[in-house]
A protein has these predicted regions:
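Canonical tetratricopeptide repeat
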Residues: 75-78, 82, 89, 129, ...
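Start-of-helix register in tetratricopeptide repeats
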Residues: 35, 78, 85, 132, ...
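Terminal, low-structured helical/coil segments at or just beyond the last alpha-helical repeat
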Residues: 210-215, 222, 226-238, 298-342
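Register position in tetratricopeptide repeats
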Residues: 46, 89, 96-97, 143, ...
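N-terminal leader/linker segments that initiate helical-solenoid repeat arrays
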Residues: 20-100, 104, 108, 112, ...
Length: 342
């Protein structure tokens, strides 16, 4: 019986030894497979096979984590450190594909890929790639809004811009674009659009985005001048004056705004103000004879009304060009009977 017990003990010890040896071999085999997977991933990444490389790096991590090899932890770290840049490069290829297709579906794929790159980079402690990828997602939201705007999907465009602004409140360009979308969506929402232009100017100055500051300033000015002229033609003079003066708040050196104010004041027989704005417009105008002619005509009109014949004649002579030539000559010859310069 003692022999049988001893034999049984030896048998069980043998099974345990064999089991431990098999486990050790399996762990050693896992590490070897992890190394092979890592090397394969490197080759695939060099060949721009980024999706395959990602899968292989993840496989290397899984295998290494199942191994007790003293080098397994280092292999896990090395594989995970490669993933942020590989995810980012994959996202870049998605973006290049979008550049070829220029459709929303391709753009969405690129955005998703860059967001994945940002998330993976954050998870594995690569803050630089995480920030870069996240910033690109914000820029692509702006790009999406442009596509939506051009296809008159105004609500979708505003939603994209709101998301971009939420991600980056200092994104001056997004405020400017939102103003354009709102203005085009409903022409009656000019005041709301102007709020966006004002915000774009404010943020643009803070981040030194001079191009957006200029564009938003011009948009505010030009839209107010356009609306002011419409109200002037509708004889809504008080509203027109308010809008034209507000245009000057955007651009105090706008020759066009001063010209339109001269025209407006002439219609209301405010001769002194008409002359003042016409003279400012002449000082600021950088265009040629065509642009100057219309200003001189308004100046001549106000001077004539004040009985300042010689000055009015001089103004109308300068106005006698292009589409203003005939009405200016009529004033010179028949209304004022100006002396001939010959």
């Amino acid at each position: 019986m003692k022999f049988l017990k001893y034999s049984a003990t030896l048998f069980m010890a043998g099974i345990l030894t064999i089991g431990l040896s098999t486990q050790a071999l399996a762990q050693s085999d896992n590490y070897s497979k992890a190394v092979a997977a890592f090397n394969k991933a490197l080759e695939q990444a060099k060949a721009n096979e980024f999706e395959s490389a990602i899968n292989m790096y993840n496989q290397a991590v899984s295998l290494a984590e199942e191994s007790d090899n003293e080098k397994a932890g280092d292999l896990v770290d090395r594989a995970q450190s490669q993933l942020p840049s590989i995810y980012f490069q994959l996202a870049v290829t998605k973006y290049k594909a979008f550049q070829q297709s220029q459709n929303i579906a391709g753009l969405e794929e690129a955005m998703t890929a860059f967001q994945e790159a940002a998330d993976i980079s954050e998870e594995y402690g690569n803050g630089q790639v995480a920030q870069k990828a996240s910033n690109i997602v914000t820029q692509l939201l702006y790009t999406r809004s442009i596509i939506e705007f051009k296809s008159q999907q105004y609500d979708a465009a505003i939603a994209s811009l709101d998301e971009a602004i939420e991600r980056n409140p200092n994104y001056a360009k997004a405020y400017y674009q939102k103003g354009l979308v709102i203005k085009n969506q409903n022409d009656e929402d000019l005041d709301i659009a102007l709020e966006m232009f004002d915000k774009a100017i404010e943020v643009g100055k803070q981040v030194n985005d001079n191009q957006i500051v200029r564009q938003a300033t011009e948009a505010g000015r030009d839209n107010l001048i356009y609306r002011g002229v419409q109200n002037m033609e509708d004889k809504n003079f008080a509203r027109a004056e308010e809008q034209l003066n507000r245009a000057l708040e955007y651009d105090a050196e706008s020759a066009n705004a001063h010209y339109r104010l001269a025209e407006l004041h002439n219609k209301q027989t405010n001769w002194d103000q008409a002359i003042s704005h016409a003279q400012k417009a002449l000082d600021l105008e950088t265009g040629g004879k065509t642009e100057l002619a219309k200003i001189y005509f308004e100046l001549g009109t106000a001077l004539k009304a004040q009985g300042r014949k010689a000055e009015a004649c001089s103004a109308f002579k300068n106005a006698a060009f292009g589409s203003f030539q005939s009405p200016a000559e009529h004033e010179i010859e028949f209304e004022l009977e100006c002396e001939s310069s010959t």
